[in-house]
Regions:
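Sec-dependent bacterial lipoprotein signal peptides
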Residues: 1-18
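Cyclophilin-like peptidyl-prolyl cis-trans isomerases
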Residues: 20-249
């Protein structure tokens, strides 16, 4: 009798042990099954990110390839095509003194296209009004920062032919392009800089020598504020007047 009870007891423990083992195995199996999709999803996300970064790198490379380095031989043909496809004519110069809104003239196509192109390339951002002559002009588009020199190197070295026969005079508020002073008997324009006439009613002695290619349509009070800044003996403001230039329309 005792032997029979002992046998039944042993069989019961064996069955219970096997059942527990099965349950534990099932739990472990469930955990592995539940975790697997998460790992796969994580791996997929990692792969997607990697592919996305690769695609972005390709886009940047393609963008760089789209820009040619301009020079005196290809600049005019380039802007001839560019002005056909880029019709924008209003820009905003933002400074700590406020905004200056400018209308670019359509009948000075190369100078308009040049200014729009440089704006879209972000060239003017973080340049300054580096020359201020009280009662005369404010001149901008340059700075002594490495960033500015680097941008010029990437865009190219070129000059623009004067376009002084369109009848635009140097009235107060017009924007005009200075000429390069280095070996430049034909007054070819320096494309990276510009000046705004502050003098009233105008600076007409400049007519015929420099190309007027736009006018201020809002913000002449800002021009007047900048023109009152204290300068050193090189006509450079003692405190930098930085600018950001954006397209309005």
């Amino acid at each position: 009798m005792r032997t029979t009870k002992l046998l039944i007891f042993c069989i019961g423990w064996t069955l219970l042990f096997n059942q527990c083992g099965t349950d534990q195995s099932k739990k472990r199996e469930d955990q592995v099954i539940k975790n697997t999709p998460a790992k796969i999803e994580e791996n997929n996300e990692s792969q997607k990110k990697s592919e996305s970064v690769g695609a972005e790198d390709k886009k940047v490379e393609e963008k760089k390839k789209d820009f040619i380095v301009l020079n005196d031989q290809n600049a005019i043909p380039f802007f001839f095509q560019y002005q056909k496809q880029n019709k924008e004519e209003k820009v905003r110069i933002s400074t700590r003194f406020g905004n200056i809104d400018i209308l670019l003239f359509k009948n000075t196509p190369y100078h308009r296209a040049n200014f729009i192109y440089l704006t879209k390339r972000g060239y003017f951002n973080n340049t300054t009004f580096h020359r201020v002559v009280p009662g005369f002009i404010i001149q901008g588009g340059n700075s002594d920062r490495y960033e500015t020199a680097k941008k010029r190197g990437e865009i190219g070295k070129y000059l623009l032919p004067p376009d002084t026969r369109k009848g635009h005079k140097h009235h107060r508020g017009v924007i005009s392009m200075p000429s390069s002073e280095i070996e430049n008997p034909y007054k070819l324009a320096s494309p990276y800089e510009f000046f705004i006439v502050q003098q009233s009613p105008g600076a007409y002695h400049l007519d015929g020598s420099y190309t007027v290619f736009g006018k201020v349509i809002a913000g002449m009070d800002v021009v007047d504020k900048i023109n009152k800044q204290r300068t050193d003996n090189r006509e450079t403001p003692l405190t930098n007047v930085f600018m950001e230039v954006s397209i309005l329309e």
